[in-house]
From Swiss-Prot:
Protein name: Cytochrome b6-f complex subunit 4
Family label: Belongs to the cytochrome b family. PetD subfamily.
Gene: petD
Subunit structure: The 4 large subunits of the cytochrome b6-f complex are cytochrome b6, subunit IV (17 kDa polypeptide, petD), cytochrome f and the Rieske protein, while the 4 small subunits are petG, petL, petM and petN. The complex functions as a dimer.
Transmembrane segments: 36-56, 95-115, 131-151
Gene Ontology biological process terms, A to Z: photosynthetic electron transport chain
Location within or outside the cell: Plastid, Chloroplast thylakoid membrane
Source organism, top-level taxon: Eukaryota
Role played: Component of the cytochrome b6-f complex, which mediates electron transfer between photosystem II (PSII) and photosystem I (PSI), cyclic electron flow around PSI, and state transitions.
GO MF terms, alphabetically ordered: electron transporter, transferring electrons within cytochrome b6/f complex of photosystem II activity; electron transporter, transferring electrons within the cyclic electron transport pathway of photosynthesis activity; oxidoreductase activity
Length: 160
């Protein structure tokens, strides 16, 4: 569909620049003004037009209409607050629940200091950070699923 410009590698001047590692700045199509003035606005306006068109042609309700005179049996927060809601719901002392929530970022801040001698970026060569991430992910999913269940089976997820 499109035409791609390729550099002429038989040109001795270009080959000399490439040998010095200077080629990426000296051949091809410049980003200014070709991309920034012509291609990007077309893509942005096309995306906006598709979004507005879909919103006009197929309007969808966000949820059921609110009734201020009928309170639901159990009020649940948004899905991304489920783990925090589960901590506050299951811990009997609310101050302890708030401290547990504050301990999560504090614990995450200590992970780099535990592995400060390890300079690798590969997760398999950073066992402490990988273990903290995996355990945190599993606990967060476990708490999130438990928050949607009744409180008597929320900690065991109804499995035990």
């Amino acid at each position: 569909m499109g035409v791609t410009k390729k550099p002429d590698l038989s040109d001795p001047v270009l080959r000399a620049k490439l040998a010095k590692g200077m080629g990426h700045n000296y051949y091809g199509e410049p980003a200014w003004p070709n991309d920034l003035l012509y291609i990007f606005p077309v893509v942005i306006l096309g995306t906006i037009a598709c979004t507005v068109g879909l919103a006009v042609l197929e309007p969808s309700m966000i949820g059921e209409p609110a009734n201020p005179f009928a309170t639901p049996l159990e009020i649940l927060p948004e899905w991304y607050f489920f783990p925090v809601f589960q901590i506050l719901r299951t811990v009997p002392n609310k101050l302890l629940g708030v401290l547990l929530m504050a301990a999560v970022p504090a614990g995450l801040l200590t992970v780099p200091f535990l592995e400060n001698v390890n300079k690798f970026q590969n997760p398999f060569r950073r066992p402490v950070a990988t273990t903290v991430f995996l355990i945190g992910t599993v606990v967060s999913i476990w708490l999130g699923i438990g928050a949607a269940l009744p409180i008597d089976i929320s900690l065991t997820l109804g499995l035990f």
